[in-house]
Amino acid sequence: MKFLTVAIVLAAAASAAPTKEVLPYPPVVAPPPYGGIAPDHNPPFGGGIPPINSGGLPPTNGAYPGGNNRHLCPSGLLYTNPQCCSAGVLGVADLDCKTPSSVPMNGADFERICAADGSKAQCCSVPVAGLALLCQDAIGTN
């Protein structure tokens, strides 16, 4: 009985031992040339470059969400927020300020958008609750 047990253990060990060829090597796949798509895949958009859709908004510089105010207001720390303000107090504080109702493309457009509401195109530093501190006329306005 012991002989049979030892024979089974040796047979199991011999069958579990690795052989010369355990698994076949995976095929070597080189990256596609020039960032293309591997030939065995279907390229999207017929192989062309997909269009970039930004949602219809112009590029932004971060100061005015969704807009492009790099030509509306000066760059820097002050006077970077485009606002439509109706009344000003000595260039220090402006009352009843709000963001433009649509995205202005340039200074004249910014002035036209604000004039439609009866306000003036201003670049302010700290707009808070309808009151804006330290304002000046927007670039490209009269």
From Swiss-Prot:
Q: Which Pfam families match?
A: Hydrophobin_2
The induction text for this entry reads: Expression is highly induced in the presence of root and stem powder of Shanxin poplar and under nitrogen or carbon starvation conditions.
Where, per UniProt, does this protein localize? Secreted; Secreted, Cell wall
Q: Which UniProt keywords apply?
A: Cell wall, Disulfide bond, Secreted, Signal
Intrachain S-S bonds = C73-C123, C84-C114, C85-C97, C124-C135
Q: Which InterPro entries match?
A: Cerato-ulmin_hydrophobin, Hydrophobin_sf
The signal peptide annotation in the UniProt record is 1-16
Q: Name one GO cellular component term.
A: extracellular region
User: Is the Ion transport keyword given for this protein?
Assistant: no
Q: Does the keyword Glycoprotein apply?
A: no
Subunit-structure text:
Homodimer. Homodimers further self-assemble to form highly ordered films at water-air interfaces through intermolecular interactions.
Describe the function of this protein: Aerial growth, conidiation, and dispersal of filamentous fungi in the environment rely upon a capability of their secreting small amphipathic proteins called hydrophobins (HPBs) with low sequence identity. Class I can self-assemble into an outermost layer of rodlet bundles on aerial cell surfaces, conferring cellular hydrophobicity that supports fungal growth, development and dispersal; whereas Class II form highly ordered films at water-air interfaces through intermolecular interactions but contribute nothing to the rodlet structure.
Give the UniProt family note: Belongs to the cerato-ulmin hydrophobin family.
Official protein name in the record: Class II hydrophobin 7
